Amino acid sequence: MAELTIPADDIQSAIEEYVSSFTADTSREEVGTVVDAGDGIAHVEGLPSVMTQELLEFPGGILGVALNLDEHSVGAVILGDFENIEEGQQVKRTGEVLSVPVGDGFLGRVVNPLGQPIDGRGDVDSDTRRALELQAPSVVHRQGVKEPLQTGIKAIDAMTPIGRGQRQLIIGDRKTGKTAVCVDTILNQRQNWESGDPKKQVRCVYVAIGQKGTTIAAVRRTLEEGGAMDYTTIVAAAASESAGFKWLAPYTGSAIAQHWMYEGKHVLIIFDDLTKQAEAYRAISLLLRRPPGREAYPGDVFYLHSRLLERCAKLSDDLGGGSLTGLPIIETKANDISAYIPTNVISITDGQCFLETDLFNQGVRPAINVGVSVSRVGGAAQIKAMKEVAGSLRLDLSQYRELEAFAAFASDLDAASKAQLERGARLVELLKQPQSQPMPVEEQVVSIFLGTGGHLDSVPVEDVRRFETELLDHMRASEEEILTEIRDSQKLTEEAADKLTEVIKNFKKGFAATGGGSVVPDEHVEALDEDKLAKEAVKVKKPAPKKKK
């Protein structure tokens, strides 16, 4: 047997050196097991330290969110394809709460509720992430709404104005033009975006919740054709997606928008629509065995929407003065705005525009019911020119609707009532507007001035819209300085109003009604004053009394 030639001291020092330099390549993972799975929900055992809203990793890289933390199991919502999740599979904790990438790289992109691009244009360029469940700005971090957000829709900007940082609910039955109102509002921000002025520019986020794929594609196409995708992000959770995605989509959109708001920028976010999010959350809650409440919704469905919509704010100047304006959409059934979800969201928001089926079917589009629609804070942000010309518009229309119902049964009306009906019919016609044709605010002021100033009283109702269109074309070509003055000063001075009246009078002389008649009103002839009339004394000769015989 050969002798050991290496000294014992060398062996000892080599072992000590190896031990001192050794690092154990081990990691501690908390692993659970799927007990049962189905319908986008999985119950997992063996994760005692998991946090609420924590991300869990299922086999195949599929993610889930821990929602129910029971004594012996965790109820998780699976985000994505849940068909391959089976009983017995291992589930790992990630130690992270749900977050999405944010930044300017999202402009012009279509993403899913996880922030992953689905438009086939490669990865989104982003190096910042934002948690989905961040608190809304506190009271001290906010300031009052004072800047207008122009929608380009006459009926809204005149009667239910929206300010930057406001939450204005768009509510109505299906197929009444709710999405069209919001898309037109996005299109109307194009001029501000092209100005390059950060104080005017408004970034837009459109969140599609449970919409048909064809509807989302049509919205994207409309925005592209209108040049609006340059400043818009679409977060899409189509009808075919899981309930988890529909529940999550609004929070993803608001996280992307909040990032810009805290950078001092102005953002508009549209939730289309929150009814479907509430229904998805109801499905998730029932599958997780949470106790149902009214209409089978869980008890925290109010909190679901309040914590989302409270993120809309006008930040204080110390935080950059950015704003996030929200236009949530709610779909009603049979015009019932007193149902559970509609009343919840009405109480959370700062006003609502109610779109009515009957008005829509009568051809009044946008079909806004003036009597029920209101804006609680936007009036402070309305420009002075619009306040001056539209001050009596709401009252005039409300009285017209009331008188219209009465006139259906009355056989004879007095002259004042007839005049009110005539003007009301012209105002209704004036407020009609084609889809995807938002109007600049200075042209809206001229248009409303026509109606409330009585300049359309001599124009036949069927010619009102043609008269308005041709007058605005004439002013763009020959009277641009009046429009520019209104746009820059945001006021309608007495001098500008006189000029505008003169332009309208001159334009009427060359405008021919459909029947070929003139629209120039007849000159008003004033009655002569009684003092100016020559007084004539009339003497009456009485016959002499007969003598008595």
Swiss-Prot record:
Produces ATP from ADP in the presence of a proton gradient across the membrane. The alpha chain is a regulatory subunit. One of its GO terms (molecular function) is proton-transporting ATP synthase activity, rotational mechanism. It catalyses: ATP + H2O + 4 H(+)(in) = ADP + phosphate + 5 H(+)(out). It comes from Mycobacterium tuberculosis (strain ATCC 25618 / H37Rv). NCBIfam families: atpA, PRK13343.1. This is ATP synthase subunit alpha. The keyword Transport applies. Belongs to the ATPase alpha/beta chains family. Keywords: ATP synthesis, ATP-binding, Cell membrane, CF(1), Hydrogen ion transport, Ion transport, Isopeptide bond, Membrane, Nucleotide-binding, Translocase, Transport, Ubl conjugation. GO terms for biological process: proton motive force-driven ATP synthesis. One of its GO terms (cellular component) is peptidoglycan-based cell wall. The record marks S373 as: Required for activity. There is a cross-link at K499 (Isoglutamyl lysine isopeptide (Lys-Gln) (interchain with Q-Cter in protein Pup)). It is a peripheral membrane protein. The gene is atpA.
